[in-house]
Structure formats: C-alpha cells, structure tokens
Amino acid sequence: WFICGVHGNEISGVDSGLMTAYHLLAAQNDEVAAAALKNSIVLIDPMQNPDGRDRFINYFRQNVGRFPDGDLQSAEHNEAWPGGRTNHYLFDMNRDWFVQSQPETRGRTKFYLEWFPQVVADQHEMGTNSSFYFAPPALPWNPNLTKTQLDWLTRLGRNNAAWFDRFKFDYFTREGYDSFYPGYGEGWPLFHGSIGMTYEQAGGPAGGLGILTNTGDTLSLFDRAYHHFTSGISTIEAASQHAGELIKEFHSYFNNAVNGNVGEY
C-alpha cells in the first residue's frame, strides 16, 4: 500500500503514485510489473491531504514567475503561513494515526483494516540539500515490534539500495527517521503487523518545480518523483517475489499475538 502526500506541500509522492499506477497498467514486457500483477495487489492512495495540497499549489501558482526560479530566496520557495503541511484544521496528520482525531486519518485506518496490506510505504519529502531515505530506520527501535519486521525492513531496504545503486541515486538509511512512535503513517501499520516504511525524498515545501541545491545542482520535481517511483517499483518487486513468505509471517504475527508469550508488563 502506497500512501502519498500526507503533508500537502511535499508534492513528489503524489506524482510518483500516478507514475507507478500508469507503469503497472501500461508497461510492456516488464518482468517486475508482470510479477506484481500476478503475485500481489498494489494499493495506491495518491493524495492523503487534499486541503493542504490545495493551499500549497495555489500559493505556488500565485508566486511563481513566467519561468520557475531555482534561487531559494525566490517567493515561490518560501511558503506563507499556514502552508500546506497540515489539513484544513491545521493538524499534522502524520502524528495522528493512533489518536485518530482527523477524518482523513480515520478514513485511512478504515481502509487499512479492510485490506490489511503486508507492506506499507509512506512517501514524504525532506530538506532540499539531503538525498533519499529508506528503511531500515534509525534507533530507537520500539520493543513491541518484532525481529521479523526489522528483518523485512532490512531486506526491502537492500533491494531499494540495489536499484538506487543501479541508477547512481544518492541515499541513506538508519539515520534521522525512527519507527518508535505509533502515530506515524508507517508506525500504526507496523503495530498491526505490516512492514511499514517511511520514504523521504529531498525537496520539501521549498522544492517547487526546481531548486538549486548547495552543490549547485538543480533538483527538479521530475527528479524527486522519479526517485520515489524507483523506490516504489523496488518495493513492489521485493514484495511480489516473496508474497507467500510475507503472508505466512503476517499470519504468524497475529497468531503469536493471541497465543504467544505475554509481555513483561
């Protein structure tokens, strides 16, 4: 399950979600797409926060010139309050998954409980001068999560690394982003047995259509969306190749919860 755009001003995940859907449906002679359609069900939620995205897109259109300006000081890269991160009620929904205070969050958890996806990828953006983050996560590791889940995070991360190495994309793991808090878009699914992951692409609210980084390179919206698309195809590949194993271990997670040992507290 790909969930995109919970922060409405982190726009590349939305575009990559559409790219992924199109690729799976239209690709010709692609072994990854064929295996995915045969062995798995791919769910894509391309827009978790329509109100925040609407605020961001309207601000950008009102402040961009005839041609995009990559200079970070340009108005198009400096979003005004309240910005597009939050929903209509100015709530950060990537903190809300276990509180369930927002209608958008309740809609996602209802959908999750209808499908129980084995793998969940929550697509985000971060600062313009970073690269790309994927699992395994940073410490601390929540003790209520299982070793099997951590092993899967590592396996999926290694497949991402292989794809990124192939295209010479920069990335990092095990730093900055942990899986401790159950209110994240990756955290709540983890506590329900899924392999939940955050994917972070450089860009963020300042990214616009293109931004000059501190190395002098231009990071375009296409670049950002393509990096997310690449991690998505990698995730689909790994999950579809090991679909039977994922389902078996997902079943074991709930069986152990009911019949396994009781926790110390």
What are these language model-derived features?
Residues 1-5, 262-265:
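Short hydrophobic beta-strand segments
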Residues 6-10, 89-102, 109, 141-153, ...:
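The substrate-binding groove and active-site-proximal loops of carbohydrate-active enzymes
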Residues 12-19, 23, 43, 88, ...:
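Extracytoplasmic/secreted proteins, especially bacterial periplasmic and envelope-associated proteins
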Residues 16-20, 34-101, 109-110, 124-143, ...:
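Surface-exposed loop and adjacent secondary-structure segments within mature catalytic domains
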Residues 21-30, 98, 113-116, 165, ...:
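Sec-exported extracytoplasmic/periplasmic mature domains
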Residues 106-130, 151-177, 189:
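Active-site-adjacent substrate-binding region
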Residues 166-265:
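Hard-cation-handling environments
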